[in-house]
Amino acid sequence: MSTHNEYDYIIIGAGSAGNVLATRLTEDADVSVLLLEAGGPDYRLDFRTQMPAALAFPLQGKRYNWAYKTDPEPFMNNRRMDCGRGKGLGGSSLINGMCYIRGNAMDYDNWASMPGLEDWTYLDCLPYFRKAETRDIGPNDYHGGDGPLRVTTPKAGNNELFAAMVEAGVQAGYPRTDDLNGYQQEGFGPMDRTVTPKGRRSSTARGYLDLAKPRPNLTIVTHALTDRILFSGKRAVGVQWLRNDQPQRATARREVLLCGGAIASPQILQRSGVGPADLLRSLDIDLVHHLPGVGANLQDHLEMYLQYECKKPVSLAPALKLYNQPAIGAEWLFLGTGIGASNQFEAGGFIRSDAEFDWPNLQYHFLPVAINYNGSNPIKAHSFQMHVGSMRSPSRGRIHVRSKDPREHPSILFNYMSHEQDWREFRAAIRITREIFAQPALAPYSGREISPGSALQTDAQIDAFVREHAETAYHPSCSNKMGHADDPMAVVDGQGRVHGLEGLRIVDASIMPQVVTGNLNAPTIMMAEKLADVIRGRTPLARSTAPYYKANGAPVRKQD
């Protein structure tokens, strides 16, 4: 057993949240931090993680991806579905789609309506979104100008399909918005991305950790697979991990900060003796504290691709040809420009499928090529697609460890599509998307519907297609939810402190009480910025006074 020094804080997981905490906590020179990461470095010369257009590559291997699989999903034809999670400095920000989407203001106001979470309103959170961000066109009431995370906006001269798809959404009666992270999320518009001015992925390893690495009070250990958190009674006092299969440990004077993400954090807690007592006893794990909510309340976003042939030769299909890729790669490598410098998700939208929803329940990503998210099944002809998925499914899943062995993946079950609302939303999503594709703005482009195919019309046909073809949007969350101690399923309080224990916080997407309306990287970074101030004992940033849109019963769409 190799024992490392004592540190003030030990952070488990160098991902979207952990790197923020490591950077902010070490701004205090008298505070020592140990940052543990199961994966390796974020190699800056590896185009797979650094080139935005190469976003599919990290999902295809296991160097940067945990490549979890779910248990057979009972409402999805018993498919074992992908559950990719980032591994390496940067975590999932190293392999995500780089969509900079914060969620809807109402998501956070909804959190704040829950007991114990009163200071999580949108106006409490907005200053921390701004603190994290440097947006390439400058700051305003909603955006930051000097944060570690670089955000790039779509520029004139990008693929003409983006503007056509936004215009088609507006022609179908839905709002137009100039900023999906600004005053009004609802509507169709340009989509920002976490990409540097030189066309590189802006992960939290590049943005945050590069600031902190030179500091003598930060120690980073990669290839450190966390085994368990060590306790003295009810107090977390250290961490044990495996490096080259050899156990090592260190002690924490102040706190252990668990930032493993929505899949890893619950399993680390359960292996450490914190979780549902019956599960832990069945695996002969010594019980430290019974917390039934650990690994419960698991949520995600599910999405479909609707693919169409493109009648004009303007899609990115030629970029998929091997003989075109050296030139694309060279332009990106030497100039930081061109197709390689974009994730190609430069437009999208959020709409309500029905007036029953107070804020958008469907998200769109537009892509000027037809291909699966992980790079499989590319369509060789000119083609394009819309990704559409529901945002706040009432379905709930769970995560259970299978053994004490940290190398064994957990049992993951999302229970996708287990609620009738899920089916209503996906039927509506496919029909609305077809209406958008039929608008005049897309008439010069839209050809044959490749997938699902125009023969698919009835509810039963659509349902069968969803069961067989819907895929994760890679947004697992909520598996250690925040809430008041009176809520038996809450795992942490509004400051990330684990109920019933001392010296242990969780800071990652697992503590969301309900998944947000959009992608998870930006909200997770915001949460870490906010809780970093709490951990450091700093006065919270002043609440924003910026106005924000509420539908307040407005029609879902304009009717001619």
UniProtKB/Swiss-Prot annotation:
Cofactor(s) of this protein: FAD
EC number of this enzyme: 1.1.99.1, 1.2.1.8
Name the pathway it acts in. Answer: Amine and polyamine biosynthesis; betaine biosynthesis via choline pathway; betaine aldehyde from choline (cytochrome c reductase route): step 1/1
Binding-site positions, FAD: 8-37
Report the superkingdom from the record: Bacteria
Annotated catalytic residues? H475 (proton acceptor)
Q: Which InterPro entries match?
A: BetA (IPR011533), FAD/NAD-bd_sf (IPR036188), GMC_OxRdtase (IPR012132), GMC_OxRdtase_N (IPR000172), GMC_OxRtase_C (IPR007867)
The main enzyme category here is oxidoreductase
Which Gene Ontology cellular-component terms appear in the entry? membrane
Q: Sorted alphabetically, which keywords does the UniProt record give?
A: FAD, Flavoprotein, NAD, Oxidoreductase
| Catalytic reaction list | choline + A = betaine aldehyde + AH2; betaine aldehyde + NAD(+) + H2O = glycine betaine + NADH + 2 H(+)
Family annotation (PROSITE patterns): GMC_OXRED_1, GMC_OXRED_2
Which biological processes are named by the entry's GO terms? Answer: glycine betaine biosynthetic process from choline
Q: Which GO terms describe its molecular function?
A: betaine-aldehyde dehydrogenase (NAD+) activity; choline dehydrogenase activity; flavin adenine dinucleotide binding
- Role summary: Involved in the biosynthesis of the osmoprotectant glycine betaine. Catalyzes the oxidation of choline to betaine aldehyde and betaine aldehyde to glycine betaine at the same rate.
Stated family: Belongs to the GMC oxidoreductase family.
Q: Name it.
A: Oxygen-dependent choline dehydrogenase
Q: Which gene encodes it?
A: betA
